[in-house]
UniProtKB/Swiss-Prot annotation:
<feature type="modified residue" description="N6,N6,N6-trimethyllysine">
    <location>
        <position position="80"/>
    </location>
</feature>
<dbReference type="GO" id="GO:0020037">
    <property type="term" value="F:heme binding"/>
</dbReference>
<protein>
    <recommendedName>
        <fullName>Cytochrome c</fullName>
    </recommendedName>
</protein>
<dbReference type="GO" id="GO:0006123">
    <property type="term" value="P:mitochondrial electron transport, cytochrome c to oxygen"/>
</dbReference>
<feature type="modified residue" description="N6,N6,N6-trimethyllysine">
    <location>
        <position position="94"/>
    </location>
</feature>
<dbReference type="InterPro" id="IPR002327">
    <property type="entry name" value="Cyt_c_1A/1B"/>
</dbReference>
<dbReference type="GO" id="GO:0005758">
    <property type="term" value="C:mitochondrial intermembrane space"/>
</dbReference>
<feature type="binding site" description="axial binding residue">
    <location>
        <position position="88"/>
    </location>
    <ligand>
        <name>heme c</name>
    </ligand>
</feature>
<keyword id="KW-0679">Respiratory chain</keyword>
<comment type="similarity">
    <text>Belongs to the cytochrome c family.</text>
</comment>
<feature type="binding site" description="covalent">
    <location>
        <position position="25"/>
    </location>
    <ligand>
        <name>heme c</name>
    </ligand>
</feature>
<feature type="binding site" description="axial binding residue">
    <location>
        <position position="26"/>
    </location>
    <ligand>
        <name>heme c</name>
    </ligand>
</feature>
<dbReference type="InterPro" id="IPR036909">
    <property type="entry name" value="Cyt_c-like_dom_sf"/>
</dbReference>
<dbReference type="GO" id="GO:0006122">
    <property type="term" value="P:mitochondrial electron transport, ubiquinol to cytochrome c"/>
</dbReference>
<keyword id="KW-0488">Methylation</keyword>
<keyword id="KW-0408">Iron</keyword>
<feature type="modified residue" description="N-acetylalanine">
    <location>
        <position position="1"/>
    </location>
</feature>
Length: 111
């Protein structure tokens, strides 16, 4: 199923998901720097593997994904299947609602 078929996302619920499942490795604030994973500020419309100052896997660079609602929705289901060889150890979010909520939060938090 695609993002177009996903339920409407709730940014507040998405923030909780981010804090429990993503924040140990990622930051969203402008200038917040990298952790285990890259800072996600300016994520939407950016190509995978291009954040300055972060050491990406060759897989993330070579995949050249343009991040947006549709690509994030597919990626967040199963990151290792979407980008084989990614360093991201996160297993993914199986529930469409959780993915929609996280994307709604990221749209606001990374803008």
């Amino acid at each position: 199923a695609s993002f177009n078929e996903a339920p409407p996302g709730n940014p507040k619920a998405g923030e909780k998901i981010f804090k429990t499942k993503c924040a140990q490795c990622h930051t969203v604030e402008k200038g917040a720097g990298h952790k285990e994973g890259p800072n996600l500020n300016g994520l939407f419309g950016r190509q995978s593997g291009t954040t300055a100052g972060y050491s990406y896997s060759a897989a993330n660079k070579n995949m050249a994904v343009n991040w947006g609602e549709n690509t994030l929705y597919d990626y967040l289901l199963n990151p290792k299947k979407y980008i084989p060889g990614t360093k991201m150890v996160f297993p993914g979010l199986k529930k469409p609602q959780e993915r929609a909520d996280l994307i709604a939060y990221l749209k606001e938090a990374t803008a």
